[in-house]
Amino acid sequence: MFDLDPINAAFYDQIKDLPCPHQMGGYQQAYDSLEQIQKHDAAPDIDTTTIQVGKRYGPTTVTLFRLKTLVDKPLPMVFYTHGGGWIMGSAKSFAVLMEDLARRTQAVIVFPDYTRVPHQTFPYPLEQSYEVLDYMVRHSNQHQILHGTIALAGDSVGGHMAIAMMQMSLERKLPTQIGQLVLWAPVTITYKKLGSYTTFSHAPFLTEDSMDWMIESFLPNKEDRQTALASPLTHLSDEVLAQFPPTIIFLSTVDPLLDEGVAFGHRLQKNGVDASIMKAEGQMHAFCAVKALRDGPTARAVIDLAALRLRRIFPQRDTPGHPS
C-alpha cells in the first residue's frame, strides 16, 4: 500500500492494527502510548542533567544532554523542540535521538519539556520555550555553554516550534547568533491542507485524522491558525524569512506533512536563504526519532548529515573515540 523500505515496512506491519493517537481515548493515553514505544535505557556515555527555568511561563523542566567526557568543558548549544502533536513526547521518549545528537555534534542539546495539551494551548508552549531559550542564552556561563553561535532544531510540531523560536528571536532581538536551523517534517500551515494530506491520509504513524485532532486541540481558536506563529508558510513575511539562517529540512516521502515542508523550503529559497530540502525515500513520519526505525540506513544517513550541518557552525573540537 505504501512505498516503504524494509525496516519501515516491518514496523508498519507491527502497528497497522493499533489505534491512532486520536483513537486512544484521550490525551494521556496517547502520551503514554508513545512513552511505551520509546522506552530506552540511558546511554552510558551521555550525561543527562535537568534544571528548572523560567518564571512567567515556568518553572519549565529542561534536560541537558552532553558527552560525559566533555561535561566540564563549555560546549555550543543546540536548542531542540520535540514533536508529538503538542500532546505527546518527553525527554525520555526522545532520549535516544538527543543522545545521538549530543554524541555526534559534541554540543549540549537543550531540551525544554514544554507544557503540552490539554494543560496549555497556543501560544503558551511557544512563549514558554522561548523563555527557556532566552534564559539559556543569557545565562550560558552558568551551564557550561559557550556564548556564541547556537542552532535550533525540531521535528514535526517541534519543527513548527523551532521556526517560531527563530521568528521570535529575530523580533525580540535574542542576544546571540543562530547559525543553523535543522527541521524534520515541520508543520508549517495549520488552517488548510496541502496535497500530501490526501495522498497520505492513512499513512503509518501519522494520519490526517490524527493531525486534525492535534491542530484542533492546540489551536482551538481558528483565527489563531492564520497567524505567522501558527502558519509560517503563508503568514510569515518575506522580510523575516530573509533573515533566517542556513536551514536543512528533512522530509519523509510517506507523510501527510511532506508538501508543506517542501513549500516552506521553497519560500526560504526564494528569499535568499541557504535552504536545503531533503526527501528520505521509503520513510514514514518520525523515522529518525522512532526507536524501531532510526537504525535503518536512511535514518542513519540523515542523522549523520544533520550532525554535520550542526557541527560546521561550532568551534571544532578533537575528541578521540567519538565520531565526527
From Swiss-Prot:
The active site is at residues 156, 255, 285. Induction: Expression is induced in response to 2-benzoxasolinone (BOA) exposure. Expression is also induced in response to 6-methoxy-2-benzoxazolinone (MBOA) and 2-aminophenol (2-AP) treatment. Its EC number is 3.1.1.-. GO terms for molecular function: hydrolase activity. Disruption phenotype: Does not affect tolerance to benzoxazolinone. InterPro entries: AB_hydrolase_3, AB_hydrolase_fold, GDXG_lipolytic_enzyme. Keywords: Hydrolase. Transmembrane segments: none annotated. Esterase; part of the Fusarium detoxification of benzoxazolinone cluster involved in the degradation of benzoxazolinones produced by the host plant. Maize, wheat, and rye produce the 2 benzoxazinone phytoanticipins 2,4-dihy-droxy-7-methoxy-1,4-benzoxazin-3-one (DIMBOA) and 2,4-dihydroxy-1,4-benzoxazin-3-one (DIBOA) that, due to their inherent instability once released, spontaneously degrade to the more stable corresponding benzoxazolinones, 6-methoxy-2-benzoxazolinone (MBOA) and 2-benzoxazolinone (BOA), respectively. Belongs to the AB hydrolase 3 family. This is Esterase FPSE_08126.
